[in-house]
A protein has these predicted regions:
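Short glycine-rich or small-residue beta-strand-to-loop segments that form or flank ligand, phosphate
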Residues: 70-80, 136-141, 164-170
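Conserved small/polar residues in nucleotide/adenosyl-binding loops
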Residues: 204-207
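N-terminal phosphate-binding or glycine-rich loops at protein starts, especially the Walker A/P-loop
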Residues: 1-15, 65-114
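Short Gly/Thr/Asp-enriched flexible loops that form oxyanion-binding sites at enzyme active sites
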Residues: 86-90, 173-188
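N-terminal low-complexity/intrinsically disordered extensions
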Residues: 1-69, 96, 128-130
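Short coil/turn connectors at secondary-structure junctions
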Residues: 66-71, 98-101, 132-135, 161-165, ...
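Glycine-rich oxoanion-binding loops at beta->alpha junctions
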Residues: 34-64, 113-164
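Short, ordered loop/turn segments at secondary-structure junctions
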Residues: 76-78, 106-112, 142-143, 171-173, ...
Length: 207
């Protein structure tokens, strides 16, 4: 595909990175959290993940050799700006820590996790989508993760690929999926971290 001068210039742009994430960092636990309302009810629903501390990242002079890790990523719900750059940032981050790390994208949203449809995201693929809009790199979907059978089916492929962290990018419904999945995997000792990344055009995660 022939690229225009604008496309080439746009791809070369380097997004701004917080100072704390430049170079070595350390994670610092802060105060324990609680919901704005209905604390008791929510704690009953999420007994293993409710009330976790705020984590901040600070610069560190300590440099560690980190082991390679495999990470999965899902684009979920309606398209929103920045989805591709979240994936690019994940790729750059895990590769900077250890070049042997791998990033896997699940195709067409949460359904790809359940149906075991995925692709390894390489530098060649990532570079085609840097600084572009849409959720086109791996596609998106609106499958809700809400049953034990779905959770267990997803865990099968996560274990097969030796994935230790799963990032779900989307709006409020998508991050609800992430919460429910994280609670189940924590309760069962699955050994998979689930991270929700807010990404929406409707600001529903702020309401």
């Amino acid at each position: 595909m022939t690229k225009s001068a604008l496309q080439i210039a746009r791809a070369a742009y380097q997004p701004k990175v917080p100072a704390a994430l430049k170079g070595a960092v350390k994670a610092v636990d802060g105060e324990y959290t609680q919901s704005v309302a209905d604390q008791d009810e929510i704690k009953k629903l999420f007994p293993n993940t409710y009330g976790m501390p705020v984590v901040t990242f600070e610069k560190s002079n300590e440099k560690k050799e980190l082991p390679a890790m495999n990470v999965g990523v899902i684009l979920s719900g309606g398209q929103a700006p920045g989805g591709h750059n979240v994936i690019a940032g994940l790729f750059d981050g895990i590769k900077a820590n250890n070049a042997a790390s791998r990033l896997y994208g699940f195709i067409l949203g949460p359904g790809g996790l359940i149906d075991h449809k995925y692709m390894e995201l390489t530098a060649d693929i990532i570079d085609e989508y840097r600084n572009t809009g849409g959720f086109d790199m791996i596609g998106s979907g609106r499958t809700k993760l809400e049953t034990k059978e779905q959770f267990d089916k997803g865990l099968e492929i996560l274990k097969e690929l030796n994935i230790k962290a799963l990032v779900i990018i989307g709006g409020d419904d998508s991050n609800t999926n992430a919460c429910v999945l994280a609670e189940y995997y924590k309760a069962t000792g699955a050994g998979v971290q689930v991270i929700g990344c807010p990404k929406t055009v409707s600001y529903t995660h702020l309401t």
